[in-house]
Amino acid sequence: AHQWFGDLVTAESSKHHWLQEGFATYYALLAEKELYGEDYFYSYLYEKAQQLKFASRTDTIPVLNAKASSLTFYEKGAWALFVLHQKIGDKAFKKAIKNYLKKHAFQTVNTNDFFVEIEKVAAFDTKLFSKVWLEDYKFNTLEANDLLKKNAAIKVQLELDQLRNTPLAEKKDFLMKVLQSDVYYTVKESVIFQLRKESYDDIKELLVLAMATKNWSIRQKIANLFPKVPEAFKADYETMLTDASYQTQEIALFQLWNSFEN
């Protein structure tokens, strides 16, 4: 991606560094979307949105600033492009990018040069967009979530997020439904995350469902769930010693050794 954004077209100053890193990150993600699918694509964007939202509590430097962090240049820059892509549509976005690269090939550019090409293909308020996504250090969670909800898996993920502080008894049926569904595996991992402070007896039905997914990543989350492996869970836990992931095997072996004398 840097062959186009960085090599073919280069930012004129560090203030506009997102034109390289944000663009390269987003286009690499678009390529991964073609390989791994939409659920992967939206799961990545969701994860980065959480990181950016958390970082904005202490990081007050926006995208259009030479001192912005790598997370801001790369990931918020990519997020800004995703928002723009969604707002003006795929056809207009691709046309603007193509025109931008052709017009400024082997030259230095600034953010306004890019916006000029956007305004040629779409009736879009680039000034407002810039204020919200490039000049404000805060992450626009409301707008981000509205776009993320277009993906069915992330819609469920956002519902799960709302239940983080809900007592287990009140959300258990929903958690079981998620684990039994064909929703993307990262959403099921979020279910495991919400079980970390619960007793084994209260969550054993959920663990049976999670283990049955046979997804190595979900099972690895279970391997790390307990400080000590419950005696009643030992037999099921031992099946992770033969999982496809060597890291899961390592975690399981250590946890079993740490939990049982023999």
Each language-model region and where it sits:
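Acidic/His/Gly-enriched intrinsically disordered linker/tail segments
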Residues: 14-82, 86-87, 104, 121, ...
